[in-house]
Amino acid sequence: MYPDDSLTLHTDLYQINMMQVYFEQGIHNKKAVFEAYFRQQPFKNGYAVFAGLERIVNYLKNLHFSESDIAYLESLGYEGAFLDYLKNFKMELTVRSAKEGDLVFANEPIVQVEGPLAQCQLVETALLNIVNFQTLIATKAARIKAVIEDEPLMEFGTRRAHEMDAAIWGTRAAVIGGASGTSNVRAGKLFDIPVLGTHAHALVQVYGDDYKAFKAYAETHRNCVFLVDTYDTLRIGVPAAIQVAREMGDRINFLGVRIDSGDIAYISKKVRQQLDEAGFTEAKIYASNDLDENTILNLKMQKAKIDVWGVGTKLITAYDQPALGAVYKIVAIEDDNGQMRNTIKLSNNAEKVSTPGKTQVWRITSREKGKSEGDYITYDGVDVNELTEIKMFHPTYTYIKKTVRDFDAIPLLVDIFKDGEQVYELPALMDIQAYARKEFDKLWDEYKRVLNPQHYPVDLAKDVWQDKMDLIDQMRQKALGGEEE
């Protein structure tokens, strides 16, 4: 490894190639605006939970080309004035973003980058890499939390995560989505997350006996959660846990037992009965074993007696949808006269047509009910709070419309960097979690459903929509050589 290694080259080669084109053509400092967004709700959910901003900030603050970066690029064939430009690179971007914990929706900008064209191009890959992963994990955690409600969710996925960075930042994202704590000690240290550890089957196997293993553990640790399913949960494991808890008395804090296999719905009811009959009515039952929101929902339908949920593989890997699919598109570019020109990306797939222009997303909230009525996308500089009513309509199915009055409009995109200088103070992680929960409570129940949620409105202001339609027509006419279809 290089002692001066940086994350600046955490990018795709074609970003560097395009930077070189812009530089050689003398347009690298033209002002540009790019916006990141995703096209479909993850997990067929009604919302997504935005995460990743802290790492984006850390990445951008340290954006520079080190000596070893320059040497490596030179080995790839880059040379001359372009390398000199990279040596003197100074981050000058203006960045606006949703806040971590914000609920975000398909086809609205969640990160907006403005500044020199070449710099905007460089950061695409890293920004998407961060947002695509962390938003996915935060959303998965929020789905699980929506099912278990006030019961604790513990993140147990480190060993199944896609490498160490994914484990650390995935844990943090899971906490934003609602996890109460983690088994990951390093994540606990870095982000001040509560940590919880029980023990593995190996401890019982080493002693060859549940009672001896639990007794040894209790003599070492005051807070005890015993894993009771190594050999036989109901006939060996739970009785041994009860015996040790009785013998140790006040010398330990008997928190409960963990079940990691078998018919959890049936076994948990029997374990609850055994603990209650032994007088340990306050002892909790912890469950793990490839759980996710769907399994937990099923267990709850069977009235399983679980108090704490340990979720690992299917949370930290976003098991049922491994990619969010966020994209990063240019929406405006400075022309030769110094004026900003809106740009659009067309496609035969309607969902892949981008929205042109630098925009702002407004969360429209009913003053009477305190609930979110939808998101309204305007051009930047418009203050929706100056309006007395908003006519919202679906950007594709325009006959779906409604008029909203007596509302508050809250801008989603806030200033993070201005001309390369950080202007946003990063909040503490648990404050972000509390904020996410507050935002979740503003959603109507129809949008919160884990299964078949209602579609949350994300609508364009009429002028934005009309300009989009006009640009589509212009580009189609250009493709046809000016002929009418």
Please place each PLM-identified region on the residue numbering.
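Short, positively charged
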Residues: 75-83, 163, 389-397
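N-terminal, Lys/Arg-enriched amphipathic/low-complexity engagement segments
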Residues: 30-88
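Gly/Ser/Thr/Ala-enriched C-terminal appendages of enzymes
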Residues: 1-30, 44-45, 291-485
